[in-house]
Amino acid sequence: MEKYITFAVEEHMTGQTVEKVLRTALGLTKRQISRAKFQADGIRKNGVQCRTTDIVQTSDQIIICIEAAKNDLNHLVSFCGDAHPLEILYEDEDILAVNKPAGILTHPSGAHYADTLSNQVSGYFHKKKVSCRVRPIGRLDKETSGIVLFAKNQVSAQRLQAQRESGILHKQYIAIVTGSFSDDTSASSNTAWHTVCFPIRKTADHPLRMEAITAFGSSFVPESADFVTPLVDMTTLLSAVTHYQVLYSSPDWSIVTLKLDTGRTHQIRVHMKALGHPLLGDTLYQKTFPADSLSEQPVFHRTALHAWKIQFRHPFNNTWISLEAPLPDDFCNCFQNINFSL
């Protein structure tokens, strides 16, 4: 599969070589550029094939052909089952955004080799005769529902991942948590955003569980492992920053929306637990309580977390794209019971 990228040279790039522009402005690798320059019309400037050493001027139009390498082709087992039909939120020639249901993994892992969201996307590409690798940009936990973004080519993947790391690409989540924020007058405001900066590490007693280190206060973010304490091994800590806003709070449970500056494993679940508000249905981070003590809480048979919104720039035309994943039935039922709407 071939992909043509068109780029207009900007004024500050005048005097640079074609190769430098392709590498700095488009983020292409030397291998991608080398592969293109040996094709007929693989790299063109103003409609004419050019050399990578040619000098560019303002408003020159550069077109490069990116050919999929062998390892770019789809290699996953295609899964086309009806249990979780693929819900597409957005698609063009470079990206695909889908609404992941709770209960399936984003990508094959362990015993789940053919029944994941990526396998479904693979089957969808196969059905449409699109030969490209399945590239999820970030992942959601198995029990988390919501938006998952896929890149259809390597350049899109590189650029979207760079946006994710720089914070240009960001998601907003909805969660239902235990307990009330009403005792905390600052956190109970439905207009204010609050920040949690507890560092996170793996626990020693469970292969999947993470924990937040609260010994230094919520504003602590480790800069290095040079600081030593007898209680905490600093080399195991990962900085983690979560922003949250309380949308609704009752005596037994609350609704919050969250944004992340970092993407650590289980970050939202761990930070909410550290605040004393573990997510409903989260059996990994919440102790089991007697049934009668949960009578005022909604019943969730999975972790009550939904990746609600995403915003990013298109990897090629740079326009902003904002998407929203419809709430799943368990969230809708919960909100309807209290006449709450987003």
Where do the model's predicted regions map?
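RNA pseudouridine synthases
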Residues: 1-342
